[in-house]
From Swiss-Prot:
Substrate binds at residues 3-8. The keyword Lyase applies. This is Putative glutathione-specific gamma-glutamylcyclotransferase 2. Belongs to the gamma-glutamylcyclotransferase family. ChaC subfamily. It catalyses: glutathione = L-cysteinylglycine + 5-oxo-L-proline. The active site is at 83 (proton acceptor). It comes from Xenopus laevis (African clawed frog). One of its GO terms (cellular component) is cytoplasm. Gene3D superfamilies: Gamma-glutamyl cyclotransferase-like (3.10.490.10). Its EC number is 4.3.2.7. Pfam families: ChaC (PF04752).
Length: 184
């Protein structure tokens, strides 16, 4: 069994796996539209983490992990708990970056628009402010954003995830502006 990571599973892998491959899935786009009250925010002040939205022209880069034989159900149970904030699973085709490897099916966790933590679209400036100010049990929401952007830049330099990289730039600008205000 393979699992596809497109958010924190790219840079925060805390489950056993025997192989990992960089690649992409099609017909989705990555968006910071999922609320997080259990990792990067708290109830009443949620952070924002990524989910996938259907997009016929979309392409989402990430990492596929092959789970150890005999441990699939154990790891899946762990991931079901980790991704407990309103995610459902689906099976999609994964296209490895290495063209010599044939596409194959992966398990995908998606925060759907009908779950209680789904925040949906908002102006990029509002999303950036929310990420800048949110903190939860797993740390600052900015860490999540910056780790994801850095990881994707390192793994897939050719990826031009406009939503992610525009948001990263905006949050860095807002953070700098807040720092400058605090030093007046």
């Amino acid at each position: 069994m393979w699992v596809f990571g497109y958010g924190s599973l790219i840079w925060k892998v805390d489950f056993p796996y025997v192989e990992k491959l960089v690649g992409y899935i099609m017909c989705y786009s990555r968006r910071f539209w999922q609320g997080s009250t259990d990792h990067r925010g708290v109830p009443g002040k949620p952070g924002r983490v990524v989910t996938l939205v259907e997009d016929p022209e979309g392409c989402v880069w990430g990492v596929a992990y092959r789970l150890p034989e005999g441990k699939e159900e154990e790891v899946k149970a762990y991931l079901d708990f980790r991704e407990k904030g309103g995610y459902r699973t689906s099976t999609v085709v994964f296209y490895p970056k290495d063209p010599s490897i044939q596409p194959f099916n992966v398990l995908l966790y998606i925060g759907t628009c009908d779950n209680p933590n789904y925040l949906g679209p908002a102006p990029l400036e509002d999303i950036a402010e929310q990420i800048l100010n949110a903190v939860g049990p797993s740390g600052r929401n900015t860490e999540y954003l910056f780790e994801l952007a850095n990881s994707l830049r390192n793994l897939v330099p050719e990826d031009a995830d406009e939503h992610l990289f525009s948001l990263e730039k905006l949050v860095r600008q807002l953070s700098e502006a807040h720092r400058n205000l605090n030093h007046l």
